[in-house]
């Protein structure tokens, strides 16, 4: 009986602590209308006046409600606006597509475990669009049991579990729209990190053939495999 009570009290304490932590993040993430200012680089930097990505829209959604509520989807305002603008453009050019964005950063930037970067508000991850073996649009399965989708695995041909495969054409359309949207905001994409073995499939897609001339890709493997998501760094002047 005592052990059961102790476990119950501990559970309540953990829930309260988690709620307080989420409240603190939400407080610092309140949009006061001031422009964002980034400091330093994607590693070791920080951010003032971060702006939160919308939870969802007509053709996009956040990767998981837990990540959204705990404040892991904040960016520099110009980058956030470019991301949203790209989704709006894709509503017209590719109305059938659905996209999922993933982690960006804290409202105030700084260290963002388990990521090595994402510290100054200029970085964001996007989950790869998928197709089922019947051609239906599917999103990367995300739950607390697979690191909110980051533990999903795809081979060098873009094939995953249960007959799922990466939709490279949808990725190419998104990156071209994001490049155009960023330029429209007076910024640009600095680089894209996507698993090197998958880049050849991306560039072979109908819309992907234009990507190498428009967007810079990191040509070596990152410290973790980027197969279930692609990482985008924006070039924004920082202090």
Task: Annotate each language-model stretch with its function.
Residues 1-17:
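N-terminal Sec-pathway targeting helices
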Residues 82-113, 191-217:
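Extended, low-complexity, intrinsically disordered C-terminal regulatory tails
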């Amino acid at each position: 009986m005592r052990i059961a009570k102790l476990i119950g009290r501990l559970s309540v304490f953990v829930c309260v602590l988690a709620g307080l932590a989420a409240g603190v993040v939400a407080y610092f993430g309140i949009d006061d209308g001031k422009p964002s200012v980034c400091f330093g680089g994607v590693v070791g930097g920080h951010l003032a006046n971060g702006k939160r990505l919308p939870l969802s829209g007509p053709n996009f959604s956040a990767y998981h409600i837990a990540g959204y509520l705990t404040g892991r989807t904040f960016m520099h305002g110009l980058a956030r606006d470019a991301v949203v603008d790209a989704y709006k453009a894709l509503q017209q050019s590719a109305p059938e597509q659905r996209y999922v964005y993933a982690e960006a950063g804290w409202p105030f930037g700084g260290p963002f475990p388990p990521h090595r970067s994402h510290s100054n508000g200029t970085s964001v991850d996007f989950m790869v669009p998928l197709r089922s073996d019947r051609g239906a649009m599917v999103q990367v399965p995300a739950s607390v049991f697979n690191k909110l989708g980051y533990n999903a695995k795809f081979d060098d041909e873009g094939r995953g579990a249960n007959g799922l495969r990466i939709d490279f054409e949808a990725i190419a359309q998104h990156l071209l729209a994001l490049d155009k949207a960023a330029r429209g905001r007076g910024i640009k994409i600095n680089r894209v990190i996507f698993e090197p073995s998958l880049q050849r499939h991306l560039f072979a897609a109908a819309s992907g053939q234009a990507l190498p001339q428009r967007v810079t890709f990191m040509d070596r493997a990152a410290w973790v495999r980027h197969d279930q998501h692609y990482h985008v760094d924006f070039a924004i002047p920082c202090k």
